[in-house]
Amino acid sequence: MSNIKFTTAAEAVKCIKSGDHIHLSSVASAPQCLIKAMCERGRNGELKDVHIHHLHTEGPAPYADPEFEGIFQLDSFFVGGNVRKVTQSGFADYIPIFLSETQKLYRSGAVPCNVAMIQVSRPDKHGYVSLGTSVDATLAAVECADNVIAVVNKYVPRSFGDAMIHS
């Protein structure tokens, strides 16, 4: 990652453009403050045709609400309780794939990634942050994205190996 800027969630999501493909980090690492700010932009008519990609996320998934039809399109690799009803109703799409193959979607270009919205641990003294519990497709999304928006969260656990990225 280069060109590091510290800013608010509302400012950070201004890099999202209509037609972009967004990756959200998974499970408890879903960046809720960024999701909320992105949805506010959608609600204000600033965005349309934005594709949201993620594995299973915990917490609210407001971008999957039918009020955002034409603004956000959810293309989920796994379907959790927070998006099950909208997926069953046809408002969101499910892309069946093995977890081990999710990184290939981004690296091959089969699924574009304009913006990766993630949570990371605090940086260590060498400037490395950890993806914590969300290495899965998030690592490939970070590597392939045009822009990475990271929420630094002191509660994200530091995991090593491929989870470490330089801030």
Where would I find each of the regions flagged by the language model?
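Conserved alpha/beta enzyme-core scaffold
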Residues: 1-167
